[in-house]
C-alpha cells in the first residue's frame, strides 16, 4: 500500500472528508515560525468545525506507539495532526456505511523532513 503525503495526494483516492493542508514555513536566521491554526482557514476551522482540545505528544526514537492497536471513534470527530519533529504514519479506515469510500484504508506518512515540512491531516 502506498503512503500518502502532499506530493501524491491528487493521484490517490483519499477517504471522503480527509483533507491534507500545507502549512507555510517562515524561516530566517533566527529560526522558524509556523502558524498552526487560524480561524480564517475555512477548510480547517469554521462554523461546525470548531476545535475543543489541542495537545502534543513526544515519543522516544525507535519506539512505535500503538503498533498493534487501532483507535476507533464511533461518534463524529475531527482530528488535526501536525508533525513538527520526527516521522509518523497515520492509518485511517472508513467504516461509515453511507460513505463512497466505505471500507477504504489510507496510510499517511508525515514528517518534518518532507518536502512541505508540515501538513494538517483533517479528518471529519
Residue ranges and their predicted role:
Residues 1-114:
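Non-catalytic, conserved peripheral segments adjacent to functional cores
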Residues 111-124:
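Conserved metal-binding segment of the jelly-roll/cupin
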Amino acid at each position: 500500500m502506498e503512503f500518502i503525503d502532499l506530493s501524491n495526494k491528487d493521484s490517490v483516492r483519499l477517504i471522503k472528508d480527509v483533507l491534507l493542508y500545507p502549512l507555510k514555513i517562515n524561516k530566517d536566521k533566527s529560526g522558524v515560525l509556523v502558524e498552526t491554526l487560524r480561524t480564517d482557514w475555512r477548510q480547517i476551522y469554521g462554523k461546525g468545525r470548531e476545535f475543543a482540545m489541542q495537545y502534543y505528544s513526544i515519543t522516544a526514537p525507535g519506539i512505535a506507539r500503538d503498533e498493534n492497536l487501532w483507535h476507533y471513534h464511533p461518534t463524529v470527530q475531527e482530528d488535526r495532526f501536525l508533525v513538527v519533529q520526527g516521522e509518523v504514519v497515520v492509518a485511517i479506515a472508513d467504516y461509515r456505511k453511507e460513505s463512497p469510500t466505505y471500507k477504504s484504508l489510507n496510510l499517511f506518512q508525515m514528517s518534518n523532513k518532507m518536502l512541505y515540512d508540515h501538513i494538517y491531516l483533517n479528518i471529519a
